[in-house]
């Protein structure tokens, strides 16, 4: 699944799933523009990619800030000539029961997890339309499909990404641009590392494959959807959850 000659823009790339996606895309030959808030971690990631012979550039930004997104994608296109692949991975949690949830925490999660995807898609589509080729991949979540108590904001944002994915797939499909989502289940990341051992053990009991997933499992799905092998797949939600949710 060579991605040689392709250019990817990955948000939430400083750690976890986003970082692993960037590394895998670069390994397959894509030039990678990595975006997140943490400049130091982005610089380390770019160094790792370039030291391995790849091409990469870092863009420290707030993905929910429209002007910062415009500036970063414009700069990425100026540097690499285009953006072929967009991976909307940026995500945060602000967990609380809905009756106690602060409006600021609702807004922050929706802005980072959902609005940022809309902003990035809007900025990369002209480049993709021009070349009549594009791959938009939104990282949603199993909780956007089945809900989760205490995560009304997170679940709503991830469910919104699924609806956005299908709408964009219909809008741009005629120009050879696909838009798909990847829905991870329980993945070992910094976001899940803070959970109690008891919670993790109970979660694993619900997974037919009997293990927690890794960022590499998600990145493999992203690389596939970014490749020519997935050229006839669009508007699809690819579950990467070990069987925790089926159907």
Regions found by a protein language model. Name each.
Residues 126, 170-174, 231:
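Alpha-helical segment proximal to the catalytic Tyr-Lys
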Residues 141:
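Residue(s) in the substrate-gating loop at a strand-loop-helix junction
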Residues 121, 157, 165:
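Active-site helix of classical SDR
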Residues 97-98, 102-110, 192, 203:
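Substrate-binding pocket helix/loop in short-chain dehydrogenase/reductase
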Residues 173, 178, 233-235, 241:
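Short, small/polar-rich loop/turn modules that mediate ligand/substrate recognition or access, typified
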Residues 39-40, 60-72, 103, 216-217:
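The beta1-alpha1 cofactor-binding region of Rossmann-like NAD(H)/NADP(H)-dependent oxidoreductases
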Residues 7, 14-15:
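Conserved glycine-rich cofactor-binding loop
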């Amino acid at each position: 699944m060579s991605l040689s000659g392709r250019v990817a823009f990955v948000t939430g790339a400083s750690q976890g799933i986003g970082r692993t996606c960037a590394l895998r895309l670069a390994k397959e030959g894509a030039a990678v523009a990595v975006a997140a808030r943490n400049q130091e971690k982005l610089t380390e990631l770019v160094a790792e990619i370039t030291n391995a012979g790849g091409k990469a550039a870092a863009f420290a930004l707030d993905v929910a800030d429209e002007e910062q997104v415009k500036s970063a994608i414009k700069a990425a296109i100026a540097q690499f000539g285009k953006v072929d692949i967009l991976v909307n991975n940026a995500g945060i949690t602000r967990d609380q029961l809905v009756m106690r949830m602060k409006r600021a925490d609702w807004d922050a999660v929706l802005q980072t997890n959902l609005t940022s995807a809309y902003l990035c898609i809007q900025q990369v589509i002209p480049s993709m339309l021009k070349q009549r080729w594009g791959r938009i991949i939104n990282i949603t979540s199993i909780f956007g499909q089945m809900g989760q108590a205490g995560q009304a904001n997170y679940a709503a944002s991830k469910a919104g990404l699924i609806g956005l994915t299908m709408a964009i797939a219909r809008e741009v499909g005629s120009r050879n641009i696909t838009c798909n989502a990847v829905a991870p289940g329980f993945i070992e990341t910094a976001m899940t590392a803070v959970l109690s051992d008891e919670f993790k053990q109970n979660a694993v009991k619900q997974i037919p494959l009997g293990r927690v997933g890794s960022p590499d499992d998600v990145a493999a799905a992203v690389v596939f959807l970014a490749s020519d092998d997935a050229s006839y797949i669009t508007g699809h939600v690819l579950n990467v959850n070990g069987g925790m949710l089926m159907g």
